[in-house]
């Protein structure tokens, strides 16, 4: 109860805010990003612009001719309070805990050379039955890389977070307490309006103690991600020596080819993405796919200036066990809260329909209301969580309906650097969950305070 009271006093949220809702400074500060390394503060070389806001002297510290230092920090406290988690089947179905994390960073520029360092201090209080390394990693190096700018080519090597497109396959895992980082190298090539990122990475495996994170020896990611205005096209290769499918553990090599169209026309906006996967796992052929659509319209002349959006996702599952083929889609390293603040199910073997409305109440307050419905794509396959772990096997059930969910969020941008938010979610079980195990309604209250500059 004490943890809940403390968290309530800290209120907060990770609700993404549209650009129009962000409070922009007089000197047109860049939008703060999750990764932080893609923010450009070089315009503050002008001392008059630095003087417009108290953060100016921190964002641009001149060190000499053509050299400067940018600094910043994120301080987040988040409480999550579950009742009947995993429909009552979790080890601790009624769990209430608080996450604390600090993410300071320093970004040094010397001519065409750059060094970026971001440590993390992350602790958890009250996680049952025990905090995992995603809840608590204590003190660690989250990001640390060197970079050289060769004009149209930028080369980078070291540890870094990755955010590709909408993070359908490669994301930062920002919602949980410990984000995901990768060790490796990356080259960004710019040709006119086109940009191509070529990368070879291994994910960082967090440990429960300080400075014990390690580069994964089992998983690897490589590929190329190209962007044009309103169009992304990419290839991603993936290897996992300890993959698990159908109770079998072995070596998985999977290739993903994706195409994404996105843009805005007047009051309308869209985001449509398709991915096909092929490869092999222990002598079995991989053939999987997904299609995700998002179409929305903003209505700025109505009260609250609402934006109505409909999202539909279809993600393949295995069609028949033992047939020599694996149709189960692998989302690789997806974003942390995939379908919403409460996301017990992940983007594998699923059909998801998600209408939502968001708007503004004035005074820096934003809200959103969402409904979700989930079905199994294939009745021969089960239900998975976001990392891709099987959480409910098919158990012979032919029911497709997994369940329905409702969610409400509210966020207040109290100052340009401080946001408070809250969310409440409820997930009612459908026929498949009712036929295969515990089937209680999950509820989750999330409270968050996030200060960053």
Which ranges hold each PLM region?
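N-terminal periplasmic/intermembrane-space "pro-region" immediately following the signal or transit peptide
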Residues: 17-95, 304-312, 320, 453
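Signature for the C-terminal beta-barrel architecture of outer-membrane proteins
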Residues: 149-155, 168-322, 380, 392-408, ...
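Structural signature of outer-membrane beta-barrel domains
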Residues: 78-82, 115, 122-126, 160-164, ...
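Surface-exposed loop and membrane-interface regions of Gram-negative outer-membrane beta-barrel proteins
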Residues: 81-100, 109-152, 166-172, 209, ...
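Extracellular/periplasmic loop regions
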Residues: 26-51, 246-247, 284-396
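Short loop/turn motifs that connect adjacent beta-strands in outer-membrane beta-barrel proteins
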Residues: 22-25, 54-71, 107-114, 150-153, ...
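Transmembrane beta-strands of outer-membrane beta-barrel proteins
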Residues: 70-80, 116-120, 156-160, 197-201, ...
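Predominantly the C-terminal beta-signal and adjacent terminal strand-loop region
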Residues: 415-448, 452
């Amino acid at each position: 109860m004490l943890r809940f009271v403390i968290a309530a006093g800290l209120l907060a949220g990770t609700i993404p805010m549209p650009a129009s809702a962000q409070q922009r400074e007089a000197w047109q500060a860049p939008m703060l990003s999750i990764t932080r390394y893609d923010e450009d503060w070089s315009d503050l070389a002008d001392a008059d612009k630095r003087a417009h806001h108290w953060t100016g002297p921190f964002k641009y510290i001149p060190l000499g001719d053509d050299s400067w230092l940018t600094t910043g920090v994120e301080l987040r406290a988040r409480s999550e309070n579950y009742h009947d988690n995993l429909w009552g089947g979790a080890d601790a179905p009624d769990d209430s805990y608080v996450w604390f994390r600090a993410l300071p960073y320093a970004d040094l520029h010397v001519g065409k050379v750059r060094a970026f360092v971001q440590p993390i201090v992350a602790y958890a209080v009250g996680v049952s039955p025990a905090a995992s390394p995603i809840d608590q990693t204590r003190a660690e190096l989250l990001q640390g890389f060197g970079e050289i700018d060769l004009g149209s080519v930028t080369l980078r090597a070291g540890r870094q977070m990755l955010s590709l497109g909408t993070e359908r396959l490669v994301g930062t895992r920002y919602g949980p307490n410990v984000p995901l980082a990768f060790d490796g190298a990356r080259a960004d090539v710019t040709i006119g309006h086109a940009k191509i990122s070529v990368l070879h990475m291994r994910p960082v495996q967090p440990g429960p103690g300080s400075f014990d994170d390690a580069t994964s020896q089992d998983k690897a990611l490589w590929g190329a991600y190209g962007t044009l205005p309103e169009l992304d096209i990419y290839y991603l290769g993936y290897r996992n020596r300890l993959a698990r499918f159908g109770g079998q553990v072995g070596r998985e090599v999977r290739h993903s080819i994706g195409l994404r169209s996105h843009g805005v026309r007047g009051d309308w906006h869209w985001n449509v993405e398709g991915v096909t996967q092929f490869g092999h796992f222990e002598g079995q052929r991989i053939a999987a796919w997904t299609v995700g659509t998002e179409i929305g319209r903003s209505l700025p002349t109505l009260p609250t200036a609402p934006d109505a959006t409909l999202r539909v996702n279809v993600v393949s599952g295995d069609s028949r066990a033992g047939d020599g083929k694996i149709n189960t889609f692998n989302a690789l390293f997806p974003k942390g809260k995939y379908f919403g603040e409460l996301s017990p199910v992940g983007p594998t073997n699923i059909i998801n329909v998600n209408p939502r409305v968001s708007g503004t109440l004035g005074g820096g307050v934003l809200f959103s209301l969402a409904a979700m419905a989930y079905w199994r794509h294939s009745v021969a396959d089960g239900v998975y969580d976001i990392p891709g772990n099987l959480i409910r096997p098919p158990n012979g059930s032919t029911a497709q309906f997994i369940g329905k969910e409702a969610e409400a969020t509210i966020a207040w941008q109290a100052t340009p650097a401080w946001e408070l938010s809250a969310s409440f979610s409820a997930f009612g079980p459908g026929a498949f969950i009712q036929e295969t195990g515990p089937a209680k309604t999950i509820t989750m209250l999330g409270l968050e305070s996030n200060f960053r500059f």
